[in-house]
C-alpha cells in the first residue's frame, strides 16, 4: 500500500479465523508481524502464506509481553494491532481516508481510536461497541501495559495527554460469539490469569476489577459486589473503566434483590454520565421494577435525547434508540396507554426490523387489543426477518386470529412450511373441518405424536373462552404486566439494561435456555477509551 503500516498480532491456534483477518487487511498494511505463542494447528503456515514474519515464543501468561515483542519487530512508521478473531471493515472510501489521515497527522498526534464492534449471541444478533487505540506511531516509548486486558493508550498519553484522536474506522470482533467462547474456554483462562497476576503484582485496581467482572460473568453477584463496592468508592471517573464499574455495581445490587441500592447508585452517577445511554436505560428498568412508569419514561426520554457516545462508553446495540423505545412501549403498556405503547413498538421496529423484543410485544398487544392493523402497518413499512414472521404464527393461533395468517399468507409461506401443524390449526379455527382434518392427518400417523394428540390440538385450536373480548384480554394482561428483567450477565459496559425487553417477551423455558448466550466483554474498559 505504501503508506507505512505494520500489522502486529499475537496468535495461538487461530487457523480457523486468521485467514479471514489477513484477507481484510491485505490492501491496508505493508508488513505483517505475527507472534505465535504455541500453535499446534496451521496458524503459522497461514500467516507465512500471507507474507508474515512469524516469531515463535513461549507463552508466559503475560499478554503485554507478547504484544510488545511484535511491536519491537515492526519496521514501518505506523502500527495497527488486530487479533485473529477480528476483521478490519473495508469501505469504498476507507483506503483513501486512511492515507489522508496518516499523511496529515500532526507531530502531536500519536494514535487513533478505532471502533471495535463485538458481535454477541449465536450469530451476532446483538453487539457492543467500544473505542480502543489500535492505530499508533511506531516509537520505542510506546508499549502495552497489563498482564491481562492489556492496553496501550496509557503509554501514549504519558507522552501526549491529548495525543489520541478519534477516527472513523471500525473493526468487527467475533470473539464473543457463543461458539467461540465455548471453544476457547475464555472464562477459565481469564480467571487463571487474573489470579496469577494478583499473586505476582498485588491488589492492583485494574486486576481487582477484572476479577469482579469475572465473578459477575458467572452470576456470582455477592462475590462481585465485595470487590465492586470498594472500587467504586476508591476510583475516580477519570479511570478508563469507571462507567462500567458504576453500571455493574448497580446491576449486581439489583440481581441480589436490592433494587433500592441499585437505584441509589444510578441516581448518584447519572449526573456525571448524563449521556451514558445504557445507564439511563438501567434507571428506567429499576423504576419499572417499582411500578413507577412515569419516572421510567423520564429516564427513557433522557436516554433517547443523549447524543451518540460510542467513543466514550462501551454500549450495547440499540441503546437510546430501538431498545429505549421498546422499554418505553412496556412502560406505556403497564400504564394502560395502549395506543402509545403501539406507537413505541412500531417506532422501534422501523429503526430495527430485527428487534424481536419489540415485535413480540407488539404481537401480544395487538392480540390483546384486537388491533391487527398494527401488525399490517409495520409489515408495510419495514422488511421483517423470517424469525419475526415465524413468531406471528403461535401468537395468531393463541389469539384465535387465523385471519392474521390469511392476511400475510405470502410472507408466511416459509414459516408455515416450518410449522406444518399451524396450517391445520388455522383451518380448524376457521371452521374448515374437512381441510383441517386433511392437514392434520399426516401427524396422526407419526408414532411420536401419539394417536390422539393432533385431535387434541385441533380441539384446542377451535376452542374459545367464553367472553374473550378485547376488554377481557386487556384486563388479564394488566393483572400480569411485563417485568423488564435484565440479563443475568454482562457485556462490555456491564449487563444489558434494555435486554430486559428482549427477555420479558420470552417464555421462562426459553429464557433459561438462552442464558448461556449472554456475552462477556467484561473488562474491555481496561483498554482505556478516550476520556472525552
What spans do the regions from the language model cover?
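Short aromatic/hydrophobic "clamp" motif used to bind/position activated sugar donors
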Residues: 79
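Short beta-strand/loop segment that forms part of the nucleotide-sugar
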Residues: 9, 25, 30-38, 55, ...
